[in-house]
């Protein structure tokens, strides 16, 4: 049976021209998501290990589940895998969004100085479908900045991404053939650079 999800929430986008030179904004999403039905979700590595410790199971075994992970059986009563029921479990984050500010100031000879800063943030969330606690990612914030000078046909800019060098992951996975081992896909750390753009 395919999982069924229920999601409701609220999104807010705001922009304020604070002064002639300064503009600020915010974008925030509040979500309340859960599995309406997910009886065949995969078990975590720990759950699978606990179930395996019960020995060979049949449909007549006195105990056929461990830690929320239940054995599945074929028509002949022998075991055919395992799964957990995640009905009602949370999906996604409680909130996420961004805050930003843009500042510009005219200079001599038609030049324009600009500076922008932004912060992206999120609540914690599970990175794997089995909701393994070891694959839970805590909430975090990332800050970016750019500043430069713009003319009619050229722009020179300095920029920094993730300037506080926040360590985050974009996903996680169980390592095959290494029971209980986990890996993570990590995102970029702090990045600094310069950019020159010229329009012909």
What are these regions (language model features)?
Residues 27, 118, 139, 157-160:
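A subset of signal/propeptide-processing and intrinsically disordered low-complexity segments
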Residues 5, 17, 138, 156-159:
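Generic secretory/membrane-interface signal
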């Amino acid at each position: 049976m395919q999982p069924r999800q229920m999601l409701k929430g609220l999104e807010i986008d705001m922009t304020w021209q604070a002064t002639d030179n300064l503009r600020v904004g915010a974008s925030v999403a509040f979500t309340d998501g859960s599995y309406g039905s997910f009886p065949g979700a995969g078990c975590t590595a720990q759950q699978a290990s606990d179930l395996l410790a019960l020995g060979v199971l049949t449909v007549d075994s006195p105990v056929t589940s461990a830690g929320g992970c239940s054995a599945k059986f074929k028509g002949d009563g022998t075991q055919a895998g395992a799964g957990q029921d995640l009905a009602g479990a949370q999906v996604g984050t409680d909130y996420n969004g961004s805050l930003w500010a843009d500042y510009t100031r005219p200079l001599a000879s038609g030049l324009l100085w600009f500076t922008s800063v932004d912060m992206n943030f999120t609540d914690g969330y599970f990175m794997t479908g089995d909701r393994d606690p070891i694959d839970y990612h805590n909430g975090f914030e990332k800050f970016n900045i750019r500043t430069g000078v713009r003319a009619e046909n050229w722009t020179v800019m300095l920029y920094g991404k993730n300037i506080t060098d926040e360590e985050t992951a974009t996903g996680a996975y169980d390592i095959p053939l290494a029971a209980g081992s986990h890996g993570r896909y990590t995102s970029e750390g702090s990045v600094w650079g310069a950019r020159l753009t010229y329009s012909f």
